[in-house]
Each structure stands twice: as C-alpha cells, then as structure tokens.
C-alpha cells in the first residue's frame, strides 16, 4: 500500500474513531440521565416514607393509609423499572466503550504502520 492510500485509510479510521467518541459521549450522557432519575426517585420515595410515617403517628384514616401504601408500591415499581433502565444503559455504554477502544487501537496501529513506511 502506498503512503497516499495509507493516509486515506488513516483519515477514514480517524473519522470512525471520532464518530465512536461522539457516540460514547452520548451514551455516557444517557446513562447519567438514567442514573440521576433513579436517584431522584429513590430520594423522593425516602422523603415520602418519612412523611407518611409522621402522618401515621399523628393519626390518619384507613383510606389515607391504604392510598399511601399503594403510592409507595407504585414508587417501588418505578424504581425497579428505572434500575433496569440504568442497567441497560450501562450495558450499552460498555459496548460503546469497546467500540471506541477498537477504533482508537486501529488508528494507532495504522499510524505506527505509517511511521514505519515513511
């Protein structure tokens, strides 16, 4: 392969690596949003439980107690779904990281080859 062809291949590989970098950044942002939402749900649930306990100590109706428990169960379901979402985002992020690493190694190998040919 002549040097012009090699430089073209390097340029294309760099573009591929740059695209992988952008995808990785997007994947990290998506994971962070999912993680933040999970933490927000967990905080809200904790605050709601504390508030519900305080209200229960002051005395509330059976209906209000039932609705409070139902709401906490709904929050549990939301938290479980969000945990699954975070796990899926983490797996996607791992895949994007591997793709970026592969692209970066390929560029590095091509650049080493170019150095040997110059």
Question: Where are each of the predicted segments found?
Answer:
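Charge-rich amphipathic alpha-helical interaction elements
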Residues: 1-118
């Amino acid at each position: 392969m002549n040097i012009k062809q090699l430089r073209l291949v390097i340029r294309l590989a760099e573009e591929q690596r740059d695209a992988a970098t952008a995808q990785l950044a997007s994947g990290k942002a998506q994971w962070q949003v999912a993680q933040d939402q999970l933490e927000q749900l967990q905080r809200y649930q904790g605050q709601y439980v504390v508030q519900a306990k305080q209200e229960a100590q002051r005395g509330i109706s059976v209906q209000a107690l039932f609705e409070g428990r139902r709401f906490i169960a709904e929050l549990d379901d939301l938290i479980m779904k969000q945990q699954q979402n975070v796990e899926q985002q983490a797996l996607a992020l791992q895949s994007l990281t591997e793709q970026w690493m592969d692209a970066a190694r390929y560029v590095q190998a091509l650049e080493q080859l170019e150095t040997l040919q110059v």
